[in-house]
């Protein structure tokens, strides 16, 4: 551990204590030596006693900087781990930091391009268009075609700072896990590992560029989503160049109203976009907060979304997709028994779970929702409530499902902000039912067979040889098993014989000893003793030597 990491660790502890976060720790995590260290090494007064725990955690993370802000944003979606109060407070964290010097941005860009900016771009603006904790965006014009572009560049030394904070977080998580015990449902080390994978993915702008290209290709002919063109020849791990867009932020409702945007169509398209990305493409944008979503300025009566920042993308396994679709359908059919079964079948909840108790818990939580009109039922909150209920049954929430839940909450929130009367169920149900029909019907079976057909056709000439080899292997296995069985039976026979002789010798030795004590002149005790010694020797020598079969 370096001096810098020790200094950073002290700063983190000091900040957490200034906000009194040690007061909210469970007794297991505050043994006597913790309290001793708290009152001696860290004699720091809690300056925020009058504020609730969730708000104190939010303020502390805001002060600790970008890595902790992003961790807080991720934790805000983990309502299977945190209470509503804490999760809601963390959801308000904003990734806003002052920009770094434009001259440093120029140096970083030219280091990646290995050429002066002016040789490739005109009108490079050193004043950033936007600034975040990991990267910064500058505008320019592409010299080759005169088109407006944006250059996204990583902050100087951001990787080193993030790696140092991640190492500190990982060590702290392991300590917390040790104090709480292995069975604790919080699983801090697992949470930090999920976060590490997510944030390190954002540090590679080349990967983000590839994600953007893939998402763009998925929606090339779409009326719902436009992804700006990426100039891949200018993309590197620390630099990304893409088309500049001139949309309206999705959160600027006044500007959208002023241009006469069709809000109902826009909200419905947002829902369709989510389900298309998840169920058709299995590749969804997992960071769709208002800062990354814009609306087109042209054709407000037929508006489309513009998606930016593809640093965090999610995918689901085929199994997870099917279980998720069935979960939604079962919920709206009020089939709580099926929901409980799905959670167990998918492995999200242990197969040892009491099915009836789990079903009843789901019913208690979900049934009151049906007292509302369908257009007031929140898909995102359905997932939240189900995860929260499953938390008491030790649910294991997969990272990809957390990303999905986060995306669904964003999309649904945006949809209802644009058009409060949005009936998410009416928009989503046909899509889900059609997808399920495609997955389990005759067409799906034919599609799966046709997909595998080229592979089977390629392997068909090898079938006779494979069958012969398997039969040959089967004969060898049978022969080997027979040999093992023979060896085992022989071993058992030897063991029985040896045990019989040893037990008999023990009986003779005991009898001889007892008789000789009564009358040493008789020859019988000596016969017993000698016979016992001989039998013991024979029995010991006849023990089976090899236990390998």
Swiss-Prot record:
Its main location: membrane. It is found in: Cell inner membrane. Pathway: Cofactor biosynthesis; ubiquinone biosynthesis [regulation]. It is an enzyme of class 2 (transferase). Residues 123-501 form the Protein kinase domain. ATP binds at residues 129-137, 152. InterPro entries: ABC1_dom (IPR004147), Kinase-like_dom_sf (IPR011009), UbiB (IPR010232), UbiB_bact (IPR045308), UbiB_kinase (IPR050154). It is a multi-pass membrane protein. The chain crosses the membrane at residues 496-516, 520-540. Its EC number is 2.7.-.-. One of its GO terms (molecular function) is protein kinase activity. One of its GO terms (cellular component) is plasma membrane. GO terms for biological process: regulation of ubiquinone biosynthetic process; ubiquinone biosynthetic process. The active site is at 287 (proton acceptor). Keywords: ATP-binding, Cell inner membrane, Cell membrane, Kinase, Membrane, Nucleotide-binding, Transferase, Transmembrane, Transmembrane helix, Ubiquinone biosynthesis. Pfam families: ABC1. Belongs to the ABC1 family. UbiB subfamily. Is probably a protein kinase regulator of UbiI activity which is involved in aerobic coenzyme Q (ubiquinone) biosynthesis. This is Probable protein kinase UbiB. It comes from Shewanella baltica (strain OS185).
């Amino acid at each position: 551990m370096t001096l810098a990491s020790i200094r950073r660790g002290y700063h983190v502890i000091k900040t957490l204590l200034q906000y009194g976060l040690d007061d909210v720790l469970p007794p297991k995590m505050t043994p006597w030596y913790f309290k001793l260290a708290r009152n001696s090494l860290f004699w720091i007064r809690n300056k925020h006693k009058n504020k609730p725990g969730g708000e104190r955690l939010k303020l502390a993370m805001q002060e600790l900087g970008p890595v902790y802000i992003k961790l807080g944003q991720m934790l805000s979606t983990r309502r299977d781990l945190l209470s509503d109060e804490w999760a809601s407070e963390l959801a308000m964290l904003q990734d806003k930091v002052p920009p770094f010097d434009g001259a440093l941005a120029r140096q970083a860009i030219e280091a990646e391009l290995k050429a002066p900016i002016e040789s490739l771009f005109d009108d490079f603006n050193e004043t950033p268009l936007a600034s975040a904790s990991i990267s910064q965006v500058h505008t320019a014009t592409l010299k080759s075609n005169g088109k407006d572009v944006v250059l996204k560049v990583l902050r100087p030394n951001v990787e080193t700072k993030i790696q140092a904070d991640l190492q500190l977080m990982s060590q702290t998580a392991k300590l917390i896990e040790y104090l709480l015990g292995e069975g604790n449902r919080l699983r801090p080390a697992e949470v930090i590992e999920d976060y590490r994978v997510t944030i390190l993915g954002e540090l590679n702008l080349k990967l983000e560029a590839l994600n953007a290209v893939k998402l763009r290709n998925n929606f090339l002919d779409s009326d719902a989503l436009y992804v700006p063109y990426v100039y891949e020849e200018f993309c590197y791990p620390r630099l990304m160049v893409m088309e500049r867009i001139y949309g309206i932020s999705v959160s600027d409702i006044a500007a959208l109203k002023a241009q006469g945007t069709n809000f109902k169509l826009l909200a419905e398209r947002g829902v369709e976009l989510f389900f298309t990305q998840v169920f058709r493409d299995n590749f969804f944008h997992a960071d769709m907060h208002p800062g990354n979503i814009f609306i087109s300025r042209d054709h407000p009566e037929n508006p489309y979304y513009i998606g930016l920042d593809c640093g965090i993308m999610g995918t689901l396994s085929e199994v997870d997709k099917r279980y998720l679709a069935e979960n939604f359908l079962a919920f709206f059919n009020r089939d709580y028994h099926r929901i409980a079964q799905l959670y167990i079948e998918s492995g999200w909840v242990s197969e040892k779970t009491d099915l009836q108790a789990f079903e009843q818990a789901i019913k208690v939580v979900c049934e009151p929702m049906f007292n509302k009109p369908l257009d007031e039922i929140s898909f995102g909150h359905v997932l939240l409530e189900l995860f929260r209920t499953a938390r008491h049954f030790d649910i294991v929430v997969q990272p990809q499902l957390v990303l999905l839940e986060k995306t669904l909450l964003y999309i649904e929130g945006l949809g209802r902000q644009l058009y409060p009367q949005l009936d998410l169920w009416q928009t989503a149900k046909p899509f889900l039912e059609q997808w399920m029909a495609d997955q389990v019907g005759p067409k799906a079976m034919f599609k799966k067979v046709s997909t595998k057909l080229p592979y089977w056709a390629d392997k068909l000439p090898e079938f006779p040889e494979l069958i012969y080899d398997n039969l040959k292997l089967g004969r060898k296995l049978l022969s080997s098993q027979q040999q093992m069985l023979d060896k085992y039976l022989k071993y058992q026979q030897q063991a029985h014989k040896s045990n019989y002789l040893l037990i008999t010798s023990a009986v003779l030795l005991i009898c001889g000893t007892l008789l000789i004590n009564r009358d040493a002149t008789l020859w019988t005790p000596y016969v017993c003793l000698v016979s016992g010694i001989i039998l013991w020797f024979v029995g010991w020598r006849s023990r089976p030597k090899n236990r390998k079969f």
